[in-house]
Amino acid sequence: MKTQFAILLVALVLFQMFAQSEAIFGAIWNGIKSLFGRRALNNDLDLDGLDELFDGEISQADVDFLKELMR
């Protein structure tokens, strides 16, 4: 039982290291891509993608949820 637990812990640590390194490598790669070419520079300055993040409509369910949080 102890060996299985130790193997599980080692596997979790290795998986976490892999997930974090993949994110770091992705950020580094995006940084390298943004250094080369005008397209990447123009894409970084394009703020139209931020319009999708804002939803101006609040549904009744959202209002009820906020009221529940504020109690």
UniProtKB/Swiss-Prot annotation:
Cellular location of this protein? Secreted; Target cell membrane
Keywords in UniProt for this one? Amidation, Antibiotic, Antimicrobial, Cleavage on pair of basic residues, Cytolysis, Membrane, Secreted, Signal, Target cell membrane, Target membrane, Toxin
Please verify whether the record's keywords include Coiled coil. no
GO MF annotation list: toxin activity
Residues forming the propeptide are 40-71
**Where on the chain is Phenylalanine amide found, per UniProt?**
F36
In terms of superkingdom, the source organism counts as Eukaryota
Site feature (Important for antibacterial activity, and hemolysis activity) residues:
W29
Biological process annotations from GO? defense response to bacterium; killing of cells of another organism
How is this chain modified after translation? Answer: IsCT2F is an enzymatic proteolytic cleavage product of IsCT2 by the proteases present in the venom.
Per the record, its GO cellular-component terms are: extracellular region; membrane; other organism cell membrane
Identify the stretch annotated as signal peptide in this record: 1-23
* Tissue distribution of the protein: Expressed by the venom gland.
Similarity-based family: Belongs to the non-disulfide-bridged peptide (NDBP) superfamily. Short antimicrobial peptide (group 4) family.
Physiological role = IsCT2 shows weak hemolytic activity and antibacterial activity against both Gram-positive and Gram-negative bacteria probably by forming pores in the cell membrane. IsCT2 adopts an amphipathic alpha-helical structure. IsCT2f shows neither hemolytic, nor antibacterial activities, surely due to the fact that it cannot apply amphipathic alpha-helical structure.
What name does this protein carry?
Answer: Cytotoxic linear peptide IsCT2
- Annotated source species: Opisthacanthus madagascariensis (Scorpion)
